[in-house]
Structures are given as C-alpha cells and as structure tokens.
Regions:
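Flexible, glycine/charge-rich interdomain/linker segments that couple
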Residues: 2-8, 115-130, 143-168
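Catalytic-core segments of nucleotide cyclases and related cyclic-nucleotide turnover enzymes
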Residues: 14-21, 91-106, 122-149
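Active-site-proximal structural segments of metal-dependent nucleotidyl cyclase/transferase enzymes
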Residues: 17-47
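Active-site-proximal alpha-helical element of nucleotidyl cyclase-like catalytic domains
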Residues: 17-20, 43-68, 104
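Short helix/loop segment flanking the catalytic signature motif in cyclic-nucleotide metabolism enzymes
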Residues: 45-52, 80-100
Length: 322
C-alpha cells in the first residue's frame, strides 16, 4: 500500500483506507466499542483542481493524530472524496468533528465555487462492517444535498434570517411543511408546549440514548409543562435547555438547564430544536395576530443540526451536543 504524497502527510490512498476500515471494524467488534467515518464530498468533481492537496492537508491538520485520513475513489462516477476514520468516536463526537472540519475548510469555499458536504456513519448503529458504513455515508451525501440547508444556502445566513425565512415561506411535503396554529384553529397556541412534551415522552422510552433539546419561549418558568414531563420521565440522556427571558424561579428548575436570553425576538418566536442519534425535529412558530401563529416544522436532520449550530454560535453557547 502506498501513500499518494510525502510520508509525513498522513494522507493515504483508497486501498489503504479500505483495508484500515476493515481492520477497525474487526477491532471495534472484538472490544465492543464504536468508531465512525466522515465522508467529505467535493463538488463539482473537478472544482478542487490544484487546491485538492491543500484541502487534504487542512483535513489532516484538523483531526486527531489517531484518526486516519485518505482519498476515497467513488465507485459510481462520484467526484473527489476524502474519508476520515475516527476510532472510538460516537454519533455526537462525529458531529463535533464535522464542525471543526467545516471551519477548517471554509476558506476554500469562499475563494472558489466549491460545495463541500460532510456525511458520516457510526459502527455498529449504521452498519456491521466498513463497507456498510461507507454505503450509508454515500447515501447520506445525496440526502444532504437535497436538504433545505443546502438548497436555500442557509449556512451563509444569520440565525434570525433563517428563522424568518423558514416561518414566512410556504413549504409542503413529508420532511418540511408549514401550518398555522392558534385560537380557533385545529392546532392550538400551545402546540410548541405539546410538541416538547411528546419529545420528552419519546426520549423516556429509550432513556440511555443521547440527545439535545432546545425549547424557546418568551419566559423561562418552573411552571412550563415540559418540566412536569421531565419529572415523570426520570433520568434520560437527552440534555434539555430552556431558552427565554429569565424569571425569578430559575433556581427551582432542576431537570433542565435554563438559558436566559433577553432578546425581544423571543417575544415573537417560539421554537424547538431536537437532535438525537436516530432523528431530528424542529418546529418554529412566529406570532401573527389574534393569538395565531405561522409555523414551520421539519424532520430534516441536517437542517436541525444546522439550526442548533447557528443558535449556539451566535449566542456563544458553546459547541455542546448530546
């Protein structure tokens, strides 16, 4: 097996990556641990040109010394792809790695007409061997390119720009749709509260599964319905954050983390962002008039993760996930 460039680059060819991936699968199965892969898809296929080596070097520099990086030739005429193998890394650890990689590769996107998609898969939840993980990650590339996050170019917009666009644009479909809620409508003005309770109830059915939930309303209070649901759920691995204007009883909230924000836009918007290993869900409701709300909801995991990333970044909340 050969390296395509200087030995100290730690950037390997496809043959080496495939062999190492098979070995990592055997090791993880033997020791009952996990590992993940990140597949980096660069479009258009010839767009990287002479900066491909620079992109590869940036990826190697961004990941850990124990991670293995190399070129992954497409089997069906895909463009140039880079693959990173992340030993002992779970789903949420992989998302944090992708955030770091995205920041490292941003300069290449601004200087050239490139589109870079980060896909991923984790052993054993997404496959029992390296080949299955790679197939899963390759399918996810196509799904991510079809996501609203990519189609509307939301990565380059501010958080509240995105919120305004999603809540004011009509969407219809299985993954993304718009609806109205409020007084006199089939869905009540308490729809967001009800959605939050349903998510907590779902999390309680698999309490060991990690997740992250942001729920934003005008004011944080110990009387919020979701807190009662959390109390009944017991210990769950989903981390719950309540966002809004801080009230006098914040110290009474024991089973969620208050995030006090004195932002007037939270008087107009309420939202839920929920991301777990298995699914993602977001609902955004914007107050209109007469106790009615214009709402948008989605099960697009890439869009949900993007919204969480934007929200955490613009309010300096750190890069915590589940």
């Amino acid at each position: 097996m050969r390296r395509p460039a200087a030995a100290d680059r730690r950037f390997y060819d496809t043959e080496f990556i495939r062999s190492y991936g098979r070995i990592e699968s055997l090791r993880a199965a033997r020791y009952n641990t996990c590992y993940s892969i990140v597949l980096i898809d660069i479009a258009p296929p010839d767009g990287a040109g002479d900066v491909y080596d620079d992109i590869a070097d940036a990826v190697v520099s961004a990941v850990r010394s124990c991670d293995v990086t190399g070129e992954m030739d497409g089997e069906h005429g895909e463009g140039r792809r880079i693959l990173v193998i992340l030993p002992e890394t779970d789903f949420f650890g992989t998302l944090l790695t992708i955030r770091k990689l995205s920041k490292s590769l941003d300069p290449f996107l601004s200087s050239r007409a490139l589109s870079i998609i980060f896909s991923h898969a984790t052993f054993p939840r997404d496959g029992k061997g390296f080949g299955e993980l790679l197939s899963r990650a390759a399918r996810l590339v196509a799904q991510k390119r079809a996501s609203l996050w990519e189609r509307l170019n939301l990565k380059d917009k501010l958080f509240w720009e995105i919120m305004g666009e999603l809540s004011s644009t009509p969407f219809s479909g299985f993954a993304n749709s718009s609806f109205d809620a409020g007084s006199g409508l089939p869905l009540s003005e308490f729809f967001v509260d009800q959605a939050g309770e349903l998510i907590v109830n779902e999390a309680s059915r698999s309490p060991q599964k990690r997740g992250i939930l942001y729920m934003a309303s005008r004011k944080i209070s110990s009387s919020l319905p979701i807190l009662k649901s959390l109390g009944l759920a017991g210990n769950v691995a989903t981390r719950v954050f309540l966002v809004g204007e801080g009230g006098p009883d914040l110290q009474e909230i024991k089973n969620a983390t208050p995030v006090p924000l004195a932002d007037p836009r939270l008087k107009e918007f309420s939202f839920i962002f929920f991301l777990s290993e298995d699914s993602g869900y977001a609902v955004i409701c914007r107050e209109c008039w007469g106790d009615t709300f214009s709402c948008f909801h989605t099960s697009d995991q890439m869009l949900v993760e993007g919204l969480i990333t934007k929200f955490q970044g613009e309010y300096a909340l750190g890069e915590q996930l589940g």
